[in-house]
Amino acid sequence: MRALLSVSDKEGIVEFAKGLEELDWQILSTGGTYKLLKAEGVKATEVSEFTASPEMFEGRVKTLHPKVHGGILHKRDDATHVAQAKEHGIEGIDLVCVNLYPFKETTIRTDDFAEIIENIDIGGPAMVRSAAKNFKDVLIVTSVLDYDEILKRLKEKSDDYEFRRSLMIKAFEHTAAYDSMIANYMNDRFNGGFGDARFIVGSKVFDTRYGENPHQKGALYEFDYFFTNNFRALKGEASFNNMTDINGALMLATSFDDAPAVAIIKHANPCGFAVKDTLLESYVAALKCDPISAYGGVVAINGTLDEELAKKINEIYVEVIIAANVDDAALKVFESKKRIKIFTQDNKFLVRANDKFDFKHIDGGFVFQERDFVKDEELENMKQMSKKFATGSELKDAQIAWKVAALTKSNCVVYVKDGAMVAIGMGMTSRVDAARAAVAKAKELKIDLSGCVLASEAFFPFRDSIDIASKVGVKCVIEPGGSIRDDEVIEAADEHGMSLYFTGVRHFLH
């Protein structure tokens, strides 16, 4: 039996080659892999010797040869194929182990297009596809994680059809992801990310028990190992809905750098948020906004969950806690709670991936766009439209209100006071209804809105929301502006003695 090993990621390849040698396999190899194997005492044969054809064009042509692809592709149970192989001196290659040139890593490391082009693998994908096509006769290995299992099955002679087929699927996933990555990069570089095709490729992290509802299948996929590197379960398993809520929580809790922010999320929308001096103070303040909706919600903690904070959270039922880090003592607080799920990123503060693009499935396709980021410049460059100036504390609250509004489903209005969200109206079909809903909820919970800052993620089309805000004592309003009736809104703010600021940037979220 003969194996061809040619890898860019050389982790575990020496041990894998030695394991094959112990099973009396002959080893073929190329370039850097060959040199490493020889240095480690593996009796490898260089592919150029096997093909009697040298590497050419600075290594661009190594394995693109009939003796390589014929050795991989000919069917062992087809008499015509076997005869042709014998006629042309083609010997079988029964295992192909390949991982591809590090294209992604190269694009991160350099902007030199010539170097990037040289890190587009040609021979590797060709071998992978050849071996995958002939998977009944050839084992195709594209993942370091499969080395031990393959050696085990070869020893036990249990490399059956189903196992080979599973490796074939992985191989085509591997080459498809690789080519998609290259195409996306070229479109990002030369077409602003909006070429004639866009590929969305993720790697499975885990299956969820079900999807959004019990009759739907579901799973979590990741880009660039984000969850592999930044998500660890300490208690319980994340559901599909948990992950969408965690996403909303992370977007909000990471919007204030290393500030001790706490976000409480329900159905991907905030029902509590605060930035106080400590995480405990932030949680207590966030919970006051809507303690009823917080029941069964997701709590995101931009810092370490300690025992004191854990005891406070444990006073109500929350389904999920996601924290930058979790103390052992804090984890013990929840030992008796069977339903709570606790996850950590094992970081000092929470992090998010900051993907550059965003997409939404629509029936028959998807819409694709640049990611909407709330930039600090929006607040730094906002224009005062009213006669009255905001105070320093009001401007701090305006920053919080603006970011919360921008990350909440439209139509949305947010009321913030002393660093905490105290009322919110969201996902409404009219902006004035969102304003009314927020005020009504605050009254129901006996929350005093006087002195609040009001934010809206899009312009107020009429002055009615400003009039409503004035009745509950709002002192400052921040919105994008851009309505044909902006003058009426400005006039209303001046009438009520409010400060009014326009950011000039809309943040619809659907």
Curated annotation (Swiss-Prot):
Keyword Transferase assigned: yes
What's a single GO MF annotation on this record? phosphoribosylaminoimidazolecarboxamide formyltransferase activity
Under the cellular component aspect of Gene Ontology, which terms does the record hold? Answer: cytosol
Q: What is this enzyme's EC?
A: 2.1.2.3, 3.5.4.10
Q: Which UniProt keywords apply?
A: Hydrolase, Multifunctional enzyme, Purine biosynthesis, Transferase
Q: In which pathway does it act?
A: Purine metabolism; IMP biosynthesis via de novo pathway; 5-formamido-1-(5-phospho-D-ribosyl)imidazole-4-carboxamide from 5-amino-1-(5-phospho-D-ribosyl)imidazole-4-carboxamide (10-formyl THF route): step 1/1; Purine metabolism; IMP biosynthesis via de novo pathway; IMP from 5-formamido-1-(5-phospho-D-ribosyl)imidazole-4-carboxamide: step 1/1
Biological process terms in GO annotation = 'de novo' IMP biosynthetic process
Q: Domain MGS-like, which positions?
A: 1-142
Q: Which InterPro entries match?
A: AICAR_Tfase_dup_dom_sf (IPR024051), Cytidine_deaminase-like (IPR016193), MGS-like_dom (IPR011607), MGS-like_dom_sf (IPR036914), PurH-like (IPR002695)
Task: Tell me which domain of life the UniProt entry assigns to the organism this sequence originates from.
Answer: Bacteria
- Matching Pfam families: AICARFT_IMPCHas, MGS
Which reactions is this enzyme annotated as catalysing?
A: (6R)-10-formyltetrahydrofolate + 5-amino-1-(5-phospho-beta-D-ribosyl)imidazole-4-carboxamide = 5-formamido-1-(5-phospho-D-ribosyl)imidazole-4-carboxamide + (6S)-5,6,7,8-tetrahydrofolate; IMP + H2O = 5-formamido-1-(5-phospho-D-ribosyl)imidazole-4-carboxamide
Its domain comment says:
The IMP cyclohydrolase activity resides in the N-terminal region.
The family line of this record is: Belongs to the PurH family.
Name this polypeptide is given: Bifunctional purine biosynthesis protein PurH
Instruction: Print the organism lineage.
Output: Bacteria, Pseudomonadati, Campylobacterota, Epsilonproteobacteria, Campylobacterales
